[in-house]
Amino acid sequence: MSEQQQWEAGVNTHENAVFSCFGGASNTGITSGLACLEAVKELGLEKAAIMCLGGLPTNVKPVLGKTRAAKKVITVDGCPFECSRKIVEQAGFKPTSSIVLTRDIGMKKKSLSEDIGKGIKGVMDYISDDEVKKAKDLIVKAVLEE
């Protein structure tokens, strides 16, 4: 079987699929993405991989196949809009766990556009290492719990 055929068939290369909001216009979206990266770094790629959220509504066969083959499907959203959960569900998958940072770690959403015209700030000035760690810990727990 060719690599392309394996992708399309959904050969399970990662035990668990993680789908994340990574909205770069707010602190919650950025924190969600960073926490997922940290969780995969801690767990290893065999245990969990951040999947291509855009591949679900566009019917990218490898993304659909790998999601079908995953033991768990975990969504991580920054805010109550829950875009990643909704996209995953609209693609026909039921998340095993749905993490929402504003709900689950009490994070307050801040739009990066609030500071436009008030001086230049780096994106990371909006991010709390403590909130990234709390979110990462929730993701790791969701992957590891039986």
Where are these regions (language model features)?
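Iron-sulfur-associated redox domains of electron-transfer enzymes in respiratory
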Residues: 1-146
